[in-house]
Swiss-Prot record:
Name by which UniProt lists this protein: Urease accessory protein UreG
GO BP annotations, alphabetical order: urea catabolic process
GTP-binding keyword on record: yes
Record-linked Gene3D superfamilies: P-loop containing nucleotide triphosphate hydrolases (3.40.50.300)
Domain of life per record: Bacteria
Subunit structure and binding partners: Homodimer. UreD, UreF and UreG form a complex that acts as a GTP-hydrolysis-dependent molecular chaperone, activating the urease apoprotein by helping to assemble the nickel containing metallocenter of UreC. The UreE protein probably delivers the nickel.
Subcellular localization, as worded in the UniProt entry: Cytoplasm
SUPFAM superfamilies, per the entry: P-loop containing nucleoside triphosphate hydrolases (SSF52540)
Chief location: cytoplasm
Amino acid sequence: MSLKIGIAGPVGSGKTSLIESLTNLLKDKYSLGIVTNDIYTTEDANYLKKTLDLDNERIIGVETGGCPHTAIRDDISMNQKAVVELEEKFNPDIVFVESGGDNLSATFSYELIDYYIYVIDVAQGADIPRKKGAGLLFSDLLIVNKTDLAPYVEIDLVDMQIDVKENRKNKPYVFISKKEPQTLNQVVSWIEALI
């Protein structure tokens, strides 16, 4: 049975890029599978197939045809089918399930995944942690992404971290940037602790 990790967050927060980075960091040690969700295309899956050194059959794109969080929370049948297909064919250690870009209320059904990560980015605004969406409050790990952009959008990362800590209570969170690859080690450590 695979460890299934959901990854949700608003459009453009860096979900696909996170999966790309994590796959590159984990693929030599673990067997991986990826399921992506888009409303009318398989754009994210196609991107990952082009950029990753991973068998294309290990990446499945789901076209939800509607509201992104419905496919990961309410009617999970298309995603479950994709996960089962990966498990039967490859028996992966880890399957990443990426939701389509959504608002702050995205949550996963725990019938689909074991744990989920919620991704926000600093360019979305300093007030995002204070808006207390379900993804931000209840995800198993919150990632504040694109910290390298903070100076350009006039975000004080210290203040943002205070807001995140206050709203997350005792739940884990990390601040990362693809431009600072060592920050991704925190996410890798979190995942490896679950295996």
